[in-house]
Amino acid sequence: MGRSLKKGPFVAASLLRKIDKLNDKGDKQVVKTWSRASTILPQMVGHTIAVHNGRQHVPVFVSEQMVGHKLGEFAPTRTFRSHSKSDKKARK
């Protein structure tokens, strides 16, 4: 079930404030955030946002195709280590 259109997209207030300040200055600094649930808005395009993945902040450069998606989609939380080869010695 999606979010009500009446409410609008969720964006952390602190993140939105930081992005608006950078847009007013015309500055392009990396913005650090822990808010993975925030929706990417059109005013965020062109900025680099460092999204926390539970261990570190992953830099995400926001492009036009990302608008409407969540920040957490672009910062993977799990690292996949390949499956071990079927080795007879390793099993014993």
UniProtKB/Swiss-Prot annotation:
The alphabetical list of record keywords is: Ribonucleoprotein, Ribosomal protein, RNA-binding, rRNA-binding
State the GO CC annotations.
cytoplasm; small ribosomal subunit
State the InterPro entries in the record.
Ribosomal_uS19, Ribosomal_uS19_bac-type, Ribosomal_uS19_CS, Ribosomal_uS19_SF
| GO molecular function terms noted in the UniProt entry | rRNA binding; structural constituent of ribosome
The record's Gene Ontology biological-process terms are: ribosomal small subunit assembly; translation
Q: Does the keyword Ribosomal protein apply?
A: yes
Q: Which Gene3D superfamilies match?
A: 30s Ribosomal Protein S19, Chain A
Record flagged with keyword Signal: no
Q: Name one Pfam family in it.
A: Ribosomal_S19
Function, in words: Protein S19 forms a complex with S13 that binds strongly to the 16S ribosomal RNA.
The record, for PANTHER family, names:
RIBOSOMAL PROTEIN S19P FAMILY MEMBER (PTHR11880), SMALL RIBOSOMAL SUBUNIT PROTEIN US19M (PTHR11880:SF8)
The entry assigns this protein to a family as follows:
Belongs to the universal ribosomal protein uS19 family.
This chain belongs to the protein called Small ribosomal subunit protein uS19
Q: Which gene encodes it?
A: rpsS
